[in-house]
């Protein structure tokens, strides 16, 4: 008999990311366009000497998924209580403000607000154009992130 020891973490993380993407597809099928735009319009952008902070409000009993982050970033739940699902965590976690954590590059999050909540991500950059932030720090899907990583590796060779 041949035995092969493998690390199951990448496989399990990929399965969790797929579940988050499946949730996102179901949410996109709902008629929530007006609400989504209203929430995006409430998003606040803050800049200070090489740091960009994106402040996002999520009302009680609402859920959202985020884009895939290209780099690691700081996260703060400033107000409220949420259930947070990420590809890198074993199971969804319910957390209450104030809470701080780091999410790694390639992370995709799903949030559900048990209370009105304020969530902030922090990124290092000198760019101060709000319209460029989303594409500068995120990609829409895990496949796009994998493509982005391949291109980075190709540029280094």
Regions found by a protein language model. Give the residues of each.
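Conserved short histidine dyad/triad with adjacent acidic residue
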Residues: 51-70, 95
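Double-stranded beta-helix
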Residues: 114-157
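Structural motif
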Residues: 81, 108, 116-118
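Glycine- and acidic-residue-biased ligand/ion/polar-headgroup-sensing regions
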Residues: 69-88
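Short acidic-glycine-tyrosine-enriched beta hairpin
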Residues: 86-110
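A generic "binding-loop/recognition-motif" signal
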Residues: 62, 70-71, 107, 115
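A short, N-terminal "cap"/entry segment at the start of jelly-roll beta-barrel domains
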Residues: 1-55, 85, 145-157
